[in-house]
Design a protein with these regions (language model features):
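Bacterial N-terminal signal peptides
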Residues: 1-12
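Extracellular or lumenal secretory-pathway regions
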Residues: 15-122, 126-129, 136, 145, ...
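Short, hydrophobic/aromatic-rich segments at coil-to-beta transitions
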Residues: 25-30, 133-140, 168-175
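Alpha-helix initiation and capping sites
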Residues: 145, 166-170, 179
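Residue-level structural signal for beta-strand termini and adjacent loop
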Residues: 142-143, 154
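Short helix-loop boundary/capping segments
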Residues: 148-167, 186-187
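Short, surface-exposed loop and linker segments with low hydrophobicity and enrichment for Pro/Ser/Thr
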Residues: 17-26, 159-170
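Short, conserved beta-strand edge motifs with alternating hydrophobic and charged residues
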Residues: 152, 175-176
């Protein structure tokens, strides 16, 4: 609880000091994201986290639950926060800047940001229907960067938004699946709140193509599962700063926290959302 409280305080302090309001959310869509993979012993596991999407007038912002206004400083929340570390889910602004998609993520020990023109997903609409929760949905399919997706959308919520980078259908995406990955809508919250972008001068700026390659090279390496920081010098001291990264590493009990963000001792096999 101490760690999560410190994280929340740090995030709030940074946000109030630097963030820019770039749109206003009309509602929030909360998704359960699950990924089937293997742990460092080769056992099948299902990692899960919540993804929160702010749906604005001109843009959307998809983010891990811990980066959203829904986070809470509770013991249960601390476990959810740690679970996010296995899944490498970035924060994605679609439509910021105008016509662009911006992706930001921590690849220890640095934060990275990549931009690209917003890609248009080429969906094939079908007559198939499925009831997902309270919504009657229609099926659509697309292939996006090496993965084929089956998505179900509802025209009951007239928005082209969806989780992560999935978008562009005649209604809100309620469910989307591709191989190891699945997103399922769990809540629609009718609340208005600012959509923000916080400039980070320390973030490493790359083209999105280069960021995607770097992410795949790091997490896709076979060494990652046994030692998630295989590509960095060993560190065992209680606290130290890694050269040129401008981050602080804290060791508490059997966990490591970098700028209050958890770092894994053992990883899970990387299942990329984008392969090309």
């Amino acid at each position: 609880m101490f760690i999560f409280g410190a994280i929340a305080l740090l995030v709030d302090m940074q946000a109030h000091a630097q963030e820019e309001v770039i749109d206003t959310a009309q509602f929030l869509a909360v998704y359960d994201y699950q990924c089937k993979t293997q742990n460092n012993e080769g056992e099948t596991v299902v990692d899960a986290m919540e993804v929160v999407v702010q749906v604005g007038r001109t843009m959307t912002k998809s983010m891990p639950w811990s980066q959203s206004s829904l986070r809470e400083p509770t013991f249960e929340a601390e476990g959810k926060f740690y679970q996010e570390t296995y899944l490498h889910m970035p924060t994605v602004w679609i439509g910021w800047p105008e016509g662009q998609t911006t992706s930001r993520e921590l690849i220890f020990p640095n934060e990275f940001e990549g931009k690209e023109p917003t890609p248009e997903l080429q969906w094939t609409l079908t007559d198939d229907t499925l009831r997902v929760g309270d919504y009657l949905c229609q099926k659509a399919t697309t292939t996006y960067r090496g993965l084929t997706w089956q998505a179900y959308y509802t025209e009951e919520i007239p928005s082209s938004a969806g989780p992560w980078r999935l978008r562009g259908l005649p209604g809100l995406i309620v469910k989307a699946e591709s191989g190891a990955h699945s997103f399922v809508l769990t809540q629609v919250l009718q609340q208005s709140e600012p959509i923000t972008y916080k400039p980070n001068p320390e973030a490493r700026q790359l083209s999105y193509k280069k960021l995607l390659k770097y992410r795949t090279d790091i997490y896709g390496n076979k060494q990652y599962v046994k030692n998630p920081v295989y590509y960095l010098p060993e560190f065992n001291e209680l606290m130290k700063t890694i050269p040129n990264a401008q981050v602080t590493v804290l060791k508490q009990f059997d966990a490591l926290f970098v700028n209050w963000m958890p770092v894994l001792h053992k990883g899970h096999v990387y299942q990329p959302l984008e392969k090309e």
